[in-house]
Amino acid sequence: YHDKLTGLFNRTYFEKKLEKIEASGVFPTSIIIGDVNGLKITNDIFGHGEGDELLKAIARILEKSCRKNDIIARWGGDEFSVILPETDYETARRICERIKKICETYKDLNIQPSIALGLDTKENNTQKLKDVVKKAEDRMYRNKLLESKSKKSGTVLSLQRTLFEKSYETEEHALRIIELSQKLGRMLGLHENELDDLKLLAGL
């Protein structure tokens, strides 16, 4: 019932635990669903080894942010989920804030880790936990869209810093190449996400 890469519980365990809590009738129960920002671009630029390190860092951040009785699982490739038993919405919201804060100050990785989060709470017996999970997931995707521009910019800057550190050329030269690539990209009518990718490639 454990994920080999992160050591967290896997999705099967998460779903079994949901069923058990549902049957017990315990509430409030809060659910957090998270999706790692920048995993694909990290894999593309630095390889899957660096992407794995990002996933492991997020797992450690979740463990540090949550409490002993919370159930933390790797839900999918870049998704994580947390069950917070007997936890109201406000307490769960503060845990989400803690996750964000630790991500922002995390120093043990080449890139800055970040994760989009969604939260919902079962507050009475008329609610089903599967619906709470769905609502938390929907909120996560909405938050990811709202945050995507700023978070992607942060990921790009973080990756650029790493590229500069790994490069034998001067940072000034790399910045000139990036500036020229951006001008060319705009002349070609590239979209913002394509310009971001071009910016990273120009720094290689």
Place the predicted regions along the sequence by residue.
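Catalytic core regions of nucleotide second-messenger enzymes
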Residues: 74, 102-120, 148-151
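Catalytic strand-loop-helix junctions within cyclic-nucleotide turnover domains
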Residues: 83-92, 109, 116-132
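Catalytic-core segments of nucleotide cyclases and related cyclic-nucleotide turnover enzymes
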Residues: 48, 93-100, 104, 122-149
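Conserved long alpha-helical elements within nucleotide-processing catalytic cores of c-di-GMP signaling
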Residues: 1, 7-30, 37-67, 73-77, ...
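Acidic/His-rich, divalent-metal-binding segments that scaffold phosphate/diphosphate chemistry
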Residues: 136-204
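The cytosolic transmitter module of two-component sensor histidine kinases
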Residues: 10, 51, 55, 92, ...
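Active-site-flanking beta-strand signature of metal-NTP-handling nucleotidyl enzymes
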Residues: 30-35, 72, 156-161
